[in-house]
Amino acid sequence: DPYNEKFRVNFEDQLDQFISLAKNNLNESTQLLLGPETALLENIWEGKINNSYSIKALRDLQSDFPNLNILIGATTYKLITSIDDRTETSRKMLNYDYFYDIYNSAIFIHDSTDIDVYHKTKLVPGVEKMPFPKLLDPLVKFAVDLGGIAGSLGKDNLNNTFSTSNTVIRPLICYESVYGDLGGGKSNLISI
């Protein structure tokens, strides 16, 4: 079962396998390494992204390949400390008065110290976005576990681009690639 193979392995093992495969194919002139949607299985908090095991390991990889930029898929979490900043997809933290949102994200790790995060804008109905949330949210606990997050993910209405020294990249995550309007502009499309 592909869901068991991907989502039942611990995040360190999956990352180590990804890095091992990458090292066998990288050289000093490689400028971009791509990882697929949800390649990073670690729960990555955006406010502490540089403390993430996965980001540290990918930074170590970059130290061996100084021109390398990395675009990789991940599930990221954003802490919301103000009740006024909550969204319709925000979830309450257990035992705390804070909320958070979960995103299907593309993380761009520059060859410098910068890290940019793109949040998927077009969510898959029924999988990443529950229709009629007030009516259907109580049913989330009955959803089939396919290795992901139950309930609606957060989204942004921003169509970010990432830049390397000689290229502009517009990441599209999975289902977004069917939306032609997301691909406009003077950028190279990369679907993860």
Regions found by a protein language model. Give the residues of each.
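Soluble catalytic regions of membrane-associated enzymes that act on cell-envelope
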Residues: 1-126, 161-166, 171-183
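Hydrophobic beta-strand scaffold positions of dinucleotide-using enzymes
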Residues: 34, 190-192
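A short, polar/charged loop-to-alpha-helix boundary motif
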Residues: 124-136
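Short, basic/low-complexity N-terminal boundary segments at the transition from targeting/disordered tails
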Residues: 137-141
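Cysteine/selenocysteine-centered motifs that mediate thiol-based redox chemistry or coordinate metal-sulfur cofactors
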Residues: 142-168, 173
